Amino acid sequence: MSPAAPSQRDRSVPAKAGAGARRTALAAALALALATASPQAFPQTPATRDALLAQARQQHGTGHRLEALAACEDLLRRWPADADALRLRVRLLAELGAAVRALELARQLPTPLPAPELARLEADAAAHQARWAQAMPADTRHPYVEADRALASPDPAAVDDAIAAADRMIALARASRSREAAGAYQALRRRGGTLPAYADTPVADALLQQRQPEQAIPLYEAASRAQPGPYPEEEADPRIGLAHAYLEAGRHRDAQQWIDRVAASEPAWLPAPGSVRPRANPHKTEAELTAALVRQQTWRYREAWRRLEALRAEGPANASIWNQLADTERARGWPRRAEDTLVGAAGLDPDDTSIRLGAIDTWRELGDFPRVEPALREVEAVVPRDPQVQLARQAWDRQRGWQFDLEHDRGRGGSPNFGDADHETQATLQSPLLGERWRIYGITRLAAANLPEGHTQRERLGLGLRGYARGFEAYVQALPAVGNQTRRTALEAGLRWLPDDYWTYTLDWSNTGDADVPLRAHYYDITAHSLNVSAQWRASERSAIKLSANADRYSDGNRRHGWEAAWTQRAYTAPWFSVDGGLQAGATSNSRSDVPYYSPSCARWIAATGRLENMLYERYERSWSHQLDLSFGSYDECRYGSGWMASAHYGQRWAPHAGLAFGWGIGWNSQPYDGKRDNRVMLDLTLHWGE
């Protein structure tokens, strides 16, 4: 079982800037109001220019910027052209957050500011404008316009000023131009410069967006030490970003320990001024969501789901909780439930990009392909720079593009069906999606075995058509014989239907029965019409029950019927490690046993099964995992009695990047056939390219 693809919040985006942003705007307005206050507000205002300037500088030096600005404005009312007061006013406005107004006044100074100081003002103004554009864009359909306009000023990188460079990095990060922000940070480091403390978090966000968690971690750690909290509601919490960086760097234990401490330290409720009812602490909620995400990304889906269900019960009006709950439900194999949850999330926040991306992922999983492209284009039209949007586009293009699969199995032993040595290869090349519902594909099958009677091989090459609908998949294919040892054209068809999140039904039919007819029967030109059906009930990733049945009508008159039932149950889960146990039982019967291939008149078996799976390495789409499958039981054949049977298989899977995966495995099987024990060793290789 592979973990679900990560669904991580864009760390460059601060918390919703609703009431907090309005308070910031109110503070700025108050600053300007105090700056223009009448001199009566300060009854001991000095009468001379030098005294007023000295008072302004003294207030500035002690950190009383509003009072300093009021004194400065009083001086300028009397001496409007005073150069020192004009320059001090620019500096005070910039420090109070009125960066745009400060820049306007700086450009009106009779004596221009030095280039480094002007560059710093330009970068500061750009950072403020980008922040406002990110939190409250004037046009939600074009959220980058204001930020890009703010960044259109000359690049201050040529000026050796760390403050100006840092402000521009902040503006770039908030304008969703994280690549440029990360590049500017690397250039600053090469020059031997350091970031001011206030820039650590936004620059770390940009580095994390560019998948450089090792570079982001020191900045997040420095920001967390410099300001351990509490944080304003509209300000991003660097401790949350640090947990994301730990997780993306593969340090999942550090991520869990850190975020659990953060969540425990945050109060659930904050006092609400003017109200007796407290308000929810958004940073507490975000920490709890991140704690659930850490568990989800390390395969502990049930624990994550339970945490999110509890959070939703406490905060049913929080769209972020609904959204992440849907992501966890999809990871547990419940896409329809996830879709319903996303509808609720969209009702709470219809403009949230991640909610729309979650719906797109759900439709892709359900095979509801016609809805994917229009929805994705609509999102791209608004936020094309969003890293999660870009990843969604790449994943969809891979899924709807060319697909190639190669499987090769090789075995050695003394089986009556397989001979001393056998091998089978199947390769499939599927076209891109046609009309969002169809694929045409080419398929080849090559199988051969060294039997006591001699060498035999079965070779086919053909075409197929596969169709998709919501929760439904069907195929039909024709594989003419190749070579002089294969007879007839194989016609095959099948379907797979998922009516809900729990049941899966499959049906496969073939007029040659290549999957069921052993190569020993093929040596004697025997084929079969075969029908295989199955029904599976899967509660979640933790348990499933499957019942399958087959009916084969051989060309030599033999009739074979069989069934098999399998139950699997999760026994243990740890980070990137799982243990499953189960039981398997089945039976088969044949109308003829006087045939040249293994055909018992009746046989029954029961076995205990186990599977251990472990992720050895994971970094974004790159992963390396291994798996061990074991089974042991009893095989009872009519007229020959019972004997033990066992099998073991060890395999690894390596995905060097998204859309490409290699697999290999080695297995061993021991089972009695007609009272004689057969031991067989197998090697299997797989390759997948596409999605």
Language-model segments: residues:
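Hydrophobic alpha-helical segments, especially transmembrane helices
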Residues: 23-24, 90
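N-terminal signal peptide c-region/cleavage motif recognized by signal peptidases
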Residues: 36-38
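N-terminal, post-signal-peptide region of Sec/Tat-exported proteins
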Residues: 64-97
